[in-house]
């Protein structure tokens, strides 16, 4: 179950969580939960330093529901993953998208965005 997969993430058992999320995507390709599932799948890759797959999964989460609850965090995760892949221009543009598309959102703090911009030398 998705609850179990989230528990695995909380306990840093990313391989078990990843397996559940991947099976969910395969078994329920039209589910309305896919934006959430891809977000958490991205988190498993992120926590395993697999930046390319993390970036792809964050992008998939965002693309499936660009105005949804997970969209700001998915874009932010995408920006960090792109930065880790040394795609700094794209990472900085993606951070700007978080600010432009979701002004005043509470999912990603302004402090986190500014800190990440600084780390990526976006100025």
Report residues per predicted region.
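Short solvent-exposed coil/turn linkers within tandem alpha-helical repeat scaffolds
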Residues: 27-33, 62-71, 100-111, 123
């Amino acid at each position: 179950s998705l609850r179990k997969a989230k528990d695995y993430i909380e306990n840093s058992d990313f391989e078990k969580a990843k397996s559940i999320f991947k099976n969910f995507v395969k078994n329920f390709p039209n589910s309305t939960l896919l934006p959430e599932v891809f977000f958490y799948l991205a988190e498993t890759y992120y926590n395993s330093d697999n930046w390319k797959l993390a970036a792809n999964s964050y992008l998939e989460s965002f693309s499936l529901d660009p105005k949804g609850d997970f969209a700001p965090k998915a874009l932010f995760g995408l920006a960090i993953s792109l930065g880790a892949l040394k795609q700094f221009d794209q990472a900085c543009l993606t951070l700007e998208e978080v600010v432009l598309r979701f002004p005043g959102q509470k999912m990603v703090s302004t402090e986190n965005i500014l800190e990440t911009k600084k780390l990526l030398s976006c100025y």
